[in-house]
Amino acid sequence: MTGIPTYHVLALSGGGYRGLYTATVLAELETVLGRPIASHFDLICGTSAGGMLALGLAAEIPAYELKALFEEQGSRIFGCRSLPRRLLGFWLTAKHDSAGLKEVLTERFQGTTIGDLKHRVLVPAVNYSTGRGQFFKTPHHPSFELDHRMKVVDVALATAAAPVYFPLARNDRGVFADGGLVGNAPGLFGLHEVKTFLAPKQDALVRVLAIGTMTIGATVRGGASLDRGFGKWRGGLFDLVISAQESSVDHMLRQALGNNYFQIDDKATPDQSKDVKALDRVSIGATNTLKDRGNHAAQRALGDPLFQPFRAHQADAPIFYHGPNKNVPEAAC
């Protein structure tokens, strides 16, 4: 296997405030590894909250700072709601205003663009203007000529515009909804990206490390009403979409990659599920559960022999064809 090109993909799922679990895992891993965790991966994919983390890691923001962003600013993102939103949220308006999220992102990323990022990244969203999935990427292929101009803040708002939780996000490319609608667990997109754009003509070895958010499987109780309008579905409809999508991707990646696929995630106990079931619940209980389980999950992964290839891998410096970090001659583009 020595001479085979090897690509490692980091895939970070969405999950609202439960992204604190993901950020805790990343912070613990980065502390032990002793260098930016992005340097261990040839591509970082992230959806919604995972998209924000992916963008942060690609900018080489320390993982412990991203963890603090969730823990310290969660109440600003999912915090106090106006009276109209308390009365009409879920029904006629989104439950939360996106102003708090935008403020937090702007304070952290300011005017940083996708082209300023130091590592390859892929962030899915749904372009509601076209009705199609859209994948924001660094310019790691000659044909990726536009996204490098986009501000990281705008991409983060697009991938995190969860239906009924936040308003749709508008930027220069259109109107966007949460990336969880097209791929809450983006590992399959990462595998496709490597096979199609990074190593299209090579017999490459691809490994995927997926980190979840303690997503609670969306299920129906035995005695629940089967005749449901929006009043009964509410946020449960979006939860079902991301839960079903995550389980499908997990199954397909296990079949496609075998031991070259490694997932870090946890199932909440019945008691803990009361704290973390809602993706916008910011409370002491939720914070403690997500951090405690994230710390334990990282320790468990570090001791697993199947994790060792991710620990040992050093990604090559990425090639960028456009933007401020362009590092290839014009003729090669």
Curated annotation (Swiss-Prot):
Short motif (GXGXXG): ranges: 14-19
Entry EC number(s): 3.1.1.32
GO molecular-function terms, A-Z: hydrolase activity
Keywords attached to this entry: Antiviral defense, Hydrolase, Lipid degradation, Lipid metabolism
Claim: Hydrolase is one of the keywords in the record: yes
Regulation: Phospholipase activity is specifically activated upon cGAMP binding, which is produced by the cognate cyclic nucleotide synthase encoded in the same operon. Is not activated by cyclic dinucleotides 2',3'-cGAMP, c-diAMP or 3',3'-c-diGMP.
Residue span of motif DGA/G: 178-180
Family affiliation: Belongs to the patatin family.
Function (record text): Effector phospholipase of a CBASS antiviral system. CBASS (cyclic oligonucleotide-based antiphage signaling system) provides immunity against bacteriophages. The CD-NTase protein (CdnA) synthesizes cyclic nucleotides in response to infection; these serve as specific second messenger signals. The signals activate a diverse range of effectors, leading to bacterial cell death and thus abortive phage infection. A type II-A(GA) CBASS system.
Annotated protein name in UniProt: cGAMP-activated phospholipase
Organism the protein comes from: Pseudomonas aeruginosa (strain BWHPSA011 / Pa011)
This protein's encoding gene: capV
